[in-house]
Amino acid sequence: VLQRLSLRTLALVALMTMPSQALDIDFEGNVELELRHFPNPARHQDMEDNFASLAAEIELGFFSPSGRHAVIIKPFARYDQHDHERSHGDLREAKYRYVNGSFEATVGVDKEFWGVTEFLHLVDIINQTDNVESIDGEQKLGQPMVKFSYASRYGTLSAYSLPFFRIRQYADPVTGRPNSGFIVDDNTSHFESGEGRRTDDYALRYQNNFGPFDIGLSWFDGTAREPQLLVPFPPEASGLANGLPMLQAYYAYLTQAGLDVQATLGSWLLKLEATQSTQNRHLPDPRFDNRPSLDMDIAEVQTDRATGGIEYTFYNFFDSGTDLGLVAEYMYDERKQKAPHPFGNDIGIGLRWTANDPQSTAILLGGLIDLDTDSTSISLEAERRLGRSFKAILEARFQDKVGADDDGAQDGFAAALADEDFMRFRLTYYF
C-alpha cells in the first residue's frame, strides 16, 4: 500500500510541476489473445493440456515541450484460464524522468536491460524475471528505483538505488504448466538480509564505445534475483501439492561484477558477457537426494560465469531481399553439472531469417546442446504483422533429447522438461 501511495504521489507531483499549457500526451497499448498447447500428458491428473489467456498492456506518457520532463505509466495484466499464478498484474513502468543535457534522473518503477548475447543474459540483474509469463527469462517485472546517469565523451556512468525487492513467481502448483518436476510455495520466501522485501540494493554501470567495441562494466550489491529453491524442514512444513512437498525460495545477499562487450565488424558481431559473484548458499542435504534444505548450514560461494559467441548476417541472401543471421554462443559456469541451472557447459546455435517485407515477417530457430550430457532442446519463434494493427506470433519449444554424463547420471534439467513440450500462439491487437 505504501508503495502504491508513493507512486501516486510521485505522479501527481511530477504532473503538477510540468508546464501544462503545451503538454504532449501519448496513449498506446495492446490486447493479446494467447493459446498454449502441451501435446504430452501431464505428470498429474489435475494439470491441463490446453490453456487460453488474455493480456493487456497500456502506456500513458506526459511530456513537457522542452523534452526535459516526462511521466510514463505502463501497467500490464493477464488472465489465464487454468493457472491462477499466471493470472497476475504488474506495473512495468511508473516513472518520472528528468533530462538536462548530459544529466538524466529517473524516479519510480522502471525496466533496465543490460547485455549483448542471445541465449543467456548474465549481467542483466536489475529487474526480477516475470517467470510466469515466459520460461525464457526475457520478460521482466517493473523495479522501483532511483537512477542517475551522466554522459560525457568518456562514457556514461549510471547509479541505481533499488529500495524494494520483487520475488519470483512460479506456475500454479496444481494446474500450472510447464511443470519442471518441482513445486514452489510462492507464499513463503526467506531472505538473508533480514529486511525482507525492503532492501538497500544498489548498482553501478559504466558504458562506452571504443571504435567497433561497445563495452559495459557493472557492479551489483544486494538481494539476488534468482532464488535458491530449498526443501523446507520438516518437509511437510509448506504443505503438499500433487502429493509432493512444496519447495521454498531463499534469496541470498549477492555481490556481482559484470562485463559485457560487443564488437561490430561489418557483417560480424562478436559478443561476450562475464560475471563473478559471491553469495551464501545452503548446502546439499543427503536426506533429500542432495537437494539443499533449510536445515543445512550456509556456505559462501564464489562463482565465475561467462557466455559469448558470434553472429554473422548474410544481407540480401542469394539476392532474395531477405536477411539470414547465424548465431553461435557458448555458455560456461565453473560449477558445471552442479550449477542450479542448465547452462553449465552448453552451446547455443540459432538461425534468424527476416523477410524485410511490409509485414515484418521473421523466423528464429534455436537449439541448445549440453556438452556434458548431450541433451538437446529446440525452439522456434515466427512472427508476422497482419494489416496495420495485428501481429501473430507462433512459438514452439521441445526437449529433443535427455542425455547423461560420463558417469551415467541423467541430466536432471532436461528430464524435468521431457514431457513439457509446448506450442504457443499469440494474436495481438495494437492501438
Model-derived segments and spans:
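Detector for outer-membrane/organellar transmembrane beta-barrel domains
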Residues: 222, 265-284, 288-369
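Extracellular loop and loop/strand-boundary signature of outer-membrane beta-barrel proteins
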Residues: 41-47, 78-82, 130-134, 188-192, ...
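Outer membrane beta-barrel
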Residues: 61-177, 211, 397, 401
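Residue-level signature of outer-membrane beta-barrel architecture
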Residues: 23-25, 60-64, 97-100, 109, ...
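Transmembrane beta-strand segments that form the barrel wall of outer-membrane beta-barrel proteins
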Residues: 33-41, 70-81, 92, 129, ...
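Residues that define the transmembrane beta-barrel architecture of outer-membrane proteins
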Residues: 48-56, 87-92, 101, 140-144, ...
